[in-house]
Amino acid sequence: LYLDKIVQSHRDVASRDQRNLDDLVGQACALSSTRGFAEQLVQGSRENLCVIAEIKRKSPSKGVLHANLDAAHIASLYEQGGASCLSVLTDEHFFGGSVEDLQIARASTSLPVIRKDFTVSEFDVVDARLMGADCVLLIAAALSDDELSRFHDLAVHIDLEVLVETHDEHELERALNVGANIVGVNQRDLITFEVDHARAERMASLIPPTVVRVAESGVRNADDARRLRDAGYDAVLVGESIVTSSDPVAAVRDLKVA
């Protein structure tokens, strides 16, 4: 399975990490405050659907999306288009991302940034904060209840926001149980890669109004965006359709439906 293979490779790396976690947590706690990720989405969604614009060079399912992507340039185009936040892939092996991409993108805009990666250990959580991310991704399908809870609490402790990604009602329940205040609903089935718009629309109504609702994957155009906005989503996380666009500014702007 696609997700299992990626997660296992990340777990293998994490198991060999010899660093002292307490030292790293201390360093993270000493950093200056982050840019408010949830707050940006809460404010923006009062006016229109927010766009979390993703910097993604390639993916296992689609191959190369944007070979010689300039992270600083595309980040500033996303900001010009009205993106509320950035999402940056830092997985090198499967997605061609890097820590450097995240740092460059964040430095070239004023937007909050989520580290998009496969978080499988406490080290991954703390590393996200140390590299400059404002928010970290936790994928419910990849983690046990204990891990989800521990990683979420550690992130909160080091002033790092958390987006918990879910795929179905059971995972949504798990996300809410750990106190997630930003929940993503991934419309793409991780096994078949098919996009299920109906499930995302159905799940929106199950997310409490105090929680920021983000729809992920399979958002291709303004019609998709409008349907998700009508279903109750505050934001869409979009990568492929804007990173491959000849005009990323317009592509982002088009998704910001009122």
Language model features with spans:
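Catalytic cores of alpha/beta
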Residues: V120-M131, H167-V178, A215, V219-V238, ...
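Conserved SAM-binding loop
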Residues: D117, V164-E165, V185, T244
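Catalytic-face loop-and-helix region of soluble metabolic enzyme cores
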Residues: I182-V238
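An N-cap/entry alpha-helix motif that binds or orients negatively charged groups
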Residues: Y2-N68
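Active-site-adjacent beta-strand anchor residues
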Residues: F95, E165, V214, G218, ...
